[in-house]
């Protein structure tokens, strides 16, 4: 029997343990720890975003893909740092995004091509995952 495959969250837990990064920080924490950890996470996300934009502007598809993965990596790492159930949250956000279809199951679009919310839209409930 095959075991379950590792999720993104599992892989980031492995990375955090290997590199002595925090996992599952719970409140209340001293504000200095919270502030420094959030500052680090913000910086990592900004750096990866800039690298992604650079790769896109240079039309380097392999680099775009790498930077997309790096950006997802640091974003999931943020959730792991605070012990948030990223995989559960992602599934709820996906379900919420799928609720943007109208009653007939058709997508709605804004003028710029972005998917619009129908009257069927249900926002995700995530507050139970971050406390």
Describe each PLM feature range.
Residues 1-68, 72-131:
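Flexible "arm" and connector segments at domain edges
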